[in-house]
Amino acid sequence: MPERCNSPVLNFSIFRPYLTKRKTKNCMSELINDFNNYRSKMNEVILAKDNLVLKRFWSLDNQAYADGALNSKTKELLGLISSMVLRCDDCIKYHLGKCHELGTTTEEMYEVFAIANLVGGSIVIPHTRRAAEYWEELLK
């Protein structure tokens, strides 16, 4: 079992909607590692089935977020807003990670959160809380 530090974090999972206290690693939280590992593992399982429609859809998704008239950072921010309004926690985590990789600032991120709440209404607030938690973990 990997070494853990004493820093607690709430774990929000689509498969475990209740809250649990967990300990995190210093470099990257278990919350982030769990999400990335699960996503990678399941992508491999799905792509190994060699379904042409799924492969084409995922290719289209990758192409859509490439630089074009809009740069990829702007597209990821738009994807994050859409994911928050649609209340897809896994999608939110994915776009938060990409936004972090692309140099999004915390100030920019909270403007995105504000727009998502304006568009989606109060039902987006719980997703904003989880997004803020995940963002804070990315910044560590």
Regions found by a protein language model. Name each.
Residues 74-83, 112-119:
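Alpha-helical scaffold segments that form or flank carboxylate-/histidine-based iron centers
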Residues 65, 69, 86-87, 104:
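Residues in soluble alpha-helical coiled-coils and helical-bundle/repeat scaffolds
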Residues 110-133:
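C-terminal structural segments of small proteins and small subunits
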Residues 95-106:
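Iron-sulfur (Fe-S) cluster-binding segments and ferredoxin-like electron-carrier domains
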Residues 73-77, 91, 108:
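Residue-level detector of well-ordered alpha-helical segments, enriched
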Residues 106-110, 139:
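Polybasic, low-complexity binding patches
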Residues 2-76, 127-140:
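Acidic, glycine/proline-rich low-complexity segments that act as flexible tails and inter-domain linkers
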